[in-house]
A protein has these predicted regions:
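Rossmann-like adenosine-cofactor binding region
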Residues: 163-258
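Short acidic low-complexity segments
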Residues: 28-37, 50-54, 170-185
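NAD(P)-binding Rossmann-fold cofactor-contacting core
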Residues: 151-169
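Glycine-rich NAD(P)-binding loop of Rossmann-like domains
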Residues: 110-144
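Phosphate/diphosphate ligand-binding glycine-rich loop within oxidoreductases
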Residues: 39-114, 122
Length: 311
């Protein structure tokens, strides 16, 4: 089996893959490989372009280094697509928790005051132990976030596509169809949704209006889940205490986009995940290693993407 690595790894991590019998590893830039070599590739580790996939005539498996797989709806059915779901939850949920506390404790506002040398008490702050935290999307990322919030005393509610037995860190577990009923109860609403037909534009002006006036909104899933113009409008109208977006629509944000300068909206450039935490890369490599072992033994893969739902 010939595997083309598109995921950048150092020499130490590369050596971990030399011990797989029957596996030939290609760490070259695809641009440096001739047509015959590309045609011999059986598997790709990384997120290939459509053009590259079409050059790999023998391709049978792609192991993405991301959890999201929505960009691969065009992939031929005979190619197995596996994702890296399970690798990103710890790092992204820490980012979410940091941003949650930054808003609740006025830390971002105090930083603005510091730049102006303004020594002033901004008054009351909020506590997680008296908050209701709702995660719309309660898989790897949302689940880790709820777990962290629960450990700090929050009342936690997880929303999944279908009704599900509640996890130990959940006080309630609800179905996606119940989101409108529970939004008015939540002090913090965290979105970690994949991009599907059902989730695009899901949080529009009507749903944002269902949230408490002083609620906090976080989005770390896909920017398309929130109608950006509606979000800017409702925040400018005085609704929502704070918003953190690690994902936006569009991405990257144009320099003149209103999200940059809207009060109480805080943006990070889609960096909560990626490989900024080395442990995340290690987890992705572990998922790939397990699936490579399965492939070499003709065993079923883990983390197979369900094409019917997009993740």
């Amino acid at each position: 089996m010939t595997i083309l690595f598109l995921t950048s790894v150092n020499d130490e991590k590369r050596h971990c893959f030399y011990d797989f019998p029957g596996a030939r590893m290609l760490f070259d830039d695809p641009k440096d490989l001739d047509a015959e070599t590309l045609a011999s590739v059986d598997a790709i580790f990384g997120n290939p372009s459509r053009d590259l996939v079409e050059k790999c005539a023998n391709l049978r498996w792609i192991q993405l280094n991301s959890a999201g797989a929505n960009k691969y709806s065009w992939l031929p059915e005979h190619i197995v697509l596996t994702n890296a779901s399970g690798a990103y939850g710890p790092a992204i949920s820490e980012h979410m928790l940091g941003c949650t506390l930054g808003i609740m404790k006025n830390l971002f506002r105090y930083h603005d005051l510091q730049k102006r040398k303004d020594w002033r008490n901004l008054g009351s702050v909020r506590m997680l132990e008296t908050s209701v935290v709702l995660s719309v999307g309660a898989g790897d990322i949302g689940g880790h976030y709820l777990h962290k919030c629960k450990s700090l005393g929050a009342y936690t509610i997880g929303i999944r596509r279908k009704a599900h037995e509640k996890a130990p860190y959940e006080d309630e577990s609800l179905a996606f169809s119940q989101v409108d009923d529970v939004l008015p109860r939540a002090d913090i609403v965290a979105l970690s949704l994949p991009e599907t037909r059902e989730t695009i534009g899901f949080f529009d002006y009507r749903r944002l209006s269902l949230m408490k006036k002083d609620a906090i909104l976080l989005n770390v899933g896909r920017g398309s889940a929130v109608v950006t113009d509606d979000l800017v409008r409702i925040v400018n109208e005085g609704h929502l205490a704070g918003v953190h977006l690690d994902v936006t629509d569009p991405e990257p944000l144009p320099e003149d986009h209103p999200l940059w300068n809207t009060e109480r909206i805080y943006v990070t450039p889609h960096i909560a995940g990626r490989f900024n935490a080395e442990v995340t890369l290690d987890r992705v490599l572990d998922i790939f290693s397990k699936n490579l072992a399965h492939a070499l033994k003709n065993e079923p893969f883990e983390n197979v993407v369900d094409r019917s739902i997009g993740y």
